[in-house]
């Protein structure tokens, strides 16, 4: 049995409306293709609390997103492309929700309903070669962002604690770790990615997908700076046996990712699968799949560091 506590509830209705308009143009001349374009997006979010102490809020985002690319055909199967685009990342409800979550009074979290869309500017240069037996795509990319949304944690050091939102019920005691979000980050990322597919025989296919990236993250307002390398890899082999049974062996992983106040956890995985299709046009498929079968448990480690505190989980 349990007793329902409305004061601890965060039951709300979230409405998210996105309107968009697109404009693009393609110009071709001999082996060159030029594509400028622009997209406008209007986002309206409304949150209304049904049960609980949370406050209703609404927020709007207006974003103009340009892009441009120049492609060049090098041969029948080869292409090169250079381009620029701006990407936006709208904060989700978990970033925006101002609910003061002090279920654990020593680890308090709260969203920020004043967040703005995160805008990232990216320049890329890519080469591709696609043929019947061999496919490859190599891309070099640099991006920067001057208003990235970062999770910020700080230790409450005042002996009397600290009050938030001018609400006497929103008190973080001395020694508590308070976390929220803010558009305070500046990031610079340079990386390379590789996709490779080789049809070694009519029944065997090998594929590799990998990337490496160097990140430099900074918040001058908070006096924070972090940088480092991150890489990920995915690859596998697929082979067709008699009776049209397809076997696949896959594996991959990633090194720890870098954030403004520390780093996340690296990981790896592996899997084995078998499949068989039936009926006309192979409309029915039977699949058997297993992954990480030699491990009962997995651990993931996160490292967060700030003024006067160090958190590991």
Report each predicted region and the residues it spans.
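C-terminal beta-signal and adjacent terminal beta-strands/loops
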Residues: 278-313
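Transmembrane beta-strands of outer-membrane beta-barrel proteins
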Residues: 1, 34-38, 66, 80-82, ...
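Surface-exposed extracellular loop regions of Gram-negative outer-membrane beta-barrel proteins
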Residues: 16-55, 61-67, 71, 76-121, 142-174, 198-214, 257, ...
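Outer membrane beta-barrel strand-and-loop segments of large Gram-negative receptors
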Residues: 3-15, 19, 110-112, 116, ...
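Outer-membrane beta-barrel strand-turn architecture
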Residues: 27-31, 64, 72-76, 88, ...
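Residues on the lipid-exposed face of transmembrane beta-strands in outer-membrane beta-barrel proteins
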Residues: 21-27, 68-72, 125-129, 140, ...
């Amino acid at each position: 049995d349990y007793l329902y506590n409305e004061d601890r509830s965060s039951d709300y209705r979230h409405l998210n409306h996105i309107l968009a308009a697109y404009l693009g143009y393609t110009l071709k001349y001999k082996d060159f293709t030029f594509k400028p374009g622009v997209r406008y997006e209007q986002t309206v979010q409304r949150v209304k609390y049904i049960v609980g102490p949370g406050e209703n809020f609404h927020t709007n985002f207006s974003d103009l997103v340009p892009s441009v690319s120049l492609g060049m055909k090098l041969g029948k199967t080869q292409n090169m492309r250079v381009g620029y685009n701006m990407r936006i990342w709208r904060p989700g409800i978990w970033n925006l929700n101002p609910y003061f979550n002090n279920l654990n009074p020593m680890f308090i979290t709260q969203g920020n309903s004043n967040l703005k869309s995160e805008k990232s500017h990216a320049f890329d240069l890519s080469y591709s070669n696609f043929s019947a037996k061999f496919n490859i795509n190599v891309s070099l990319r640099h991006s920067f962002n001057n208003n990235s949304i970062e999770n910020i944690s700080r230790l409450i050091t005042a002996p009397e604690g600290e009050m938030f939102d001018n609400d006497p019920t929103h008190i973080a005691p001395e020694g508590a770790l308070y976390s929220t979000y803010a558009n305070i980050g500046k990031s610079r990322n340079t990386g390379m990615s590789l996709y490779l597919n080789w049809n070694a025989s009519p029944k065997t296919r090998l594929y590799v997908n990998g990337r490496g990236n160097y990140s430099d993250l900074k918040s001058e307002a908070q006096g924070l700076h972090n940088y480092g390398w991150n890489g990920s890899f995915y690859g596998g082999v697929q082979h067709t046996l008699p009776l049209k049974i397809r076997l696949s062996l896959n594996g991959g992983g990633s090194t720890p990712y870098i954030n403004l106040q520390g780093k996340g956890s690296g990981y790896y995985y592996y899997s084995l699968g078998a499949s068989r299709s039936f009926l006309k046009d192979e409309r029915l498929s039977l699949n058997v799949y297993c992954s990480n079968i030699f491990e009962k448990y997995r651990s993931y480690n996160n490292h967060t560091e700030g003024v006067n505190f160090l958190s590991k989980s």
